[in-house]
Design a protein with these regions (language model features):
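Gly/Ser/Thr/Pro-enriched helix-cap/hinge segments flanking short amphipathic alpha-helices
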Residues: 55, 65, 86, 388-390, ...
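Bacterial signal peptide processing site
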Residues: 23-26
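Short, conserved, GDST-rich strand-edge loop motifs in beta-rich repeat architectures
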Residues: 116-128, 227-254, 415-432
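Hydrophobic beta-strand segments that make up the repeating blades of beta-propeller
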Residues: 110-117, 168-177, 223-227, 301-306, ...
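Blade-edge beta-strand/turn elements of extracellular beta-propeller
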Residues: 69-72, 141-151, 191-201, 268-280, ...
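Beta-propeller blade termini
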Residues: 97-107, 135, 156-170, 183-185, ...
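Beta-propeller blade signature
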Residues: 131-136, 257-264, 315, 371-373, ...
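Repeat-based blade/solenoid architectures
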Residues: 78-99, 127, 149-161, 200-211, ...
Length: 611
């Protein structure tokens, strides 16, 4: 029987053991934005109402009072429960949990939710758990439409990624799994078809995270899938915390697996170009993936976290290949030069430098990592200086991402926590299996404040947190949270009063670029001095994906506030739009500027948006 070293307790993620981001009537664009409205069609019923010329949100209608997150799971009608299949054998995959993805699958302008589920082990359990798609009813409730949508497929699911890989105007879903991945094509009629075999993306192995991105800027979304370790029931190791009972083992006892890069051929099929692209790495034990443009050259790079192995940063060489540069960039190891148990990750410009920095969830006693992008391809670990290290030191963080919960223009940080060992307290009485999430408020100047205990009681509840994402499910302008728990119920947390500041929500539609506009860079500037930058992105977090629309917090309401938008599309096309009123949902189409716009009702009024 293999015994754990206490040192191992500081590790892994799936591991075991132990301590484990209106136009004014005369809006203009530098790209000679068309003055004609696009024609109506099935995919574009209308181009939207006439542009606003004033801030349509009345001050009297603005919420007031402290911001808080409220658990509305039950009243929203969400009954999803993750099933790990655990029956006492302590198999490694049982520690992983599963992801959650925000998706507007029917293009009604309301974010729906897709939860990934696992399954029972052969010979154990009579039920057949499925992943679940919940349709947004536009009244604060959801309906489970999994079976009618054609998504009731049994698998040991882990993660998900959302993207329109065939550019037909309907977002598709890719699900990673222990026993072969699945690509579900959105048919546009409320149903999905499993096209895995035809597309050639089954990718057998221990797949974890996934991300859609156009690495060669050809207008079609490619797919990167991270892999964990070489594990099977037959090769499962035996470990113990108390020398008597079996515990979950560390990933250090297993060989790694390389991730996979699939190139979109444009005919519904994909080609495995991992080795050709320079991404083959059989030592990797990868969990999280972040889309990042390290050097702002317009070509998408990849950051991949590894569990008990060095993280990887792949710079795009513009010729279909990548160069690994994590060590020279300063993001491979901790400041002390040690490998950490990297899990969920995200990239965002949190301090208005115009450069994306990185946040990473790590194991117990490792704290969150915050790598600041200093420019010139170099990063510095600011976790201690920023104030997030001390509060997160005892947590085992799976999901970690930036989002502006109070819309002040400064991205905050959310972390979903939960240990991997249900018996961890045997060796560390102060460490618990269930842990409360963490919320860090961005104070500006690179500093954060732990406000978990100041935003209501929902975030104080200990859970075995795993996947997490943000979305504005009630269309009131602020960002809500959804998270999964390992072998437990999902949580939907509504942001109450988070929309007291101005905001602008933007959806992108590519024409020369990929349809979702993933990789598009948007800069918002106000007369008051705010200069904000965000990128449309897939993936991030842990096994999960937040909504594709981008939300800019614009700070305190001011009369006659207008903003300017500058967007660089993945194709390289640049557009500028001036005199835009805040508190709107804009749809921007590449080459045409504002396709449609709707005022945001701060009470969550109904408005629809077309893809």
């Amino acid at each position: 029987m293999i015994l754990f070293r206490i040192r191992l307790l500081l590790y892994p993620s799936t591991l075991l053991l132990i301590l484990l981001s209106a136009c004014h009537q005369s809006s203009q664009t530098q790209s000679q934005q068309s003055s004609e409205k696009p024609p109506a069609s099935a995919a574009n019923p209308a181009s939207g109402p006439a542009p606003s010329t004033s801030n349509t949100v009345a001050e009297a209608s603005r919420p007031s009072g402290p911001i808080r997150f409220t658990d509305v799971t039950a009243q929203a009608g969400i009954h999803f429960r993750h099933n790990s299949g655990a029956f006492g054998k302590k198999y490694l995959p049982e520690t992983m949990g599963s992801g959650v993805c925000a998706i507007d699958y029917d293009n009604d302008g309301w974010q729906d939710i897709f939860f990934v589920n696992s399954k029972n082990w052969p010979g154990h359990g009579d039920t057949k758990p499925y992943s679940a798609l919940y349709h947004n009813n536009q009244d604060g409730t959801f309906t489970d439409v999994t079976k009618q949508a054609g998504l009731a497929t049994e698998m040991y699911g882990l993660g998900c990624a959302v993207g329109d890989y065939d550019n037909d105007g309907h977002d598709d879903i890719y699900v990673t799994a222990l026993d072969g991945n699945h690509l579900f094509r959105n048919l546009g009629n409320g149903k999905f078809a499993d096209v895995t075999a035809r597309a050639g993306v089954r990718d057998p192995g221990f797949a974890t995270g996934a991300i859609w991105f156009d690495y060669d800027n050809d207008g079609k979304l490619d797919l990167y899938v991270s892999h964990y370790v070489d594990w099977s029931v037959a090769t499962d190791q035996t470990c113990s915390l108390d020398t008597k009972n079996k515990s979950y083992c560390t990933p250090e006892l297993y060989k790694g697996q390389s991730g996979t890069l699939f190139h979109n051929k444009g005919n519904g099929g994909f080609e495995d170009v991992t080795k050709k692209a320079g991404l083959y790495d059989p030592t990797g034990k990868s969990l999280g993936i972040a889309l990042i443009d390290v050097d702002n050259d317009g070509w998408m790079d990849l950051f991949v976290t590894n569990d008990t192995q060095a993280n990887k940063l792949y710079r795009n060489n513009h010729n279909g290949t990548f160069t690994e540069m994590a060590l020279e960039a300063g993001v491979a190891y901790s400041d002390a030069g040690k490998k950490r148990a990297g899990m969920g990750t995200d990239a965002e410009d949190y301090d208005s430098t115009g450069r994306q920095s990185l946040v990473i969830g790590n194991f117990t006693n490792e704290s969150l990592s915050l790598y600041h992008n200093d420019g010139s391809g170099l990063f510095s670990d600011n976790s201690v200086a920023s104030g997030i290290a001390s509060s997160s030191a005892s947590s085992l963080t799976f999901s970690a991402f930036f989002f502006d919960y109070d819309l002040d223009g400064l991205p905050d940080i959310f972390a979903a926590n939960g240990h991997v060992a249900d018996d961890v307290s045997v060796v560390q009485p102060t460490i618990h299996y269930a842990e409360p999430p963490l919320l860090f408020h961005n104070k500006g100047h690179g500093k954060f404040d732990d406000v978990t205990d100041r935003v209501g009681t929902a975030l104080r509840q200990p859970v075995v947190g795993r996947g997490a994402a943000y979305l504005d499910f009630d269309n009131d302008g602020d960002l809500d949270l959804v998270l999964t728990t390992s072998n437990g119920p999902a949580k939907l947390l509504r942001n109450e009063n988070g929309n007291q500041n101005d905001m602008l929500r933007i959806k992108t539609i590519g024409t020369r670029s990929n349809r979702d506009g993933i990789g598009a860079k948007i800069t918002v500037t106000t007369r008051e001095g705010l200069h904000l930058f965000k990128m449309v992105k897939s993936g991030s977090s842990y096994l999960s994906q937040s909504e594709l629309p981008v939300t800019f917090g614009l700070g305190k309401p001011r009369a006659n506030k207008v903003v300017s938008l500058d967007i660089i599309w993945p194709s390289g096309k640049k557009e500028s739009i001036r005199n835009v009123q805040p508190n709107q949902f804009l749809t921007l189409e590449e080459g045409k500027g504002i396709l449609s716009q709707h005022p945001i009702d701060l009470n969550g009024a109904k408005h629809s948006e077309t893809k």
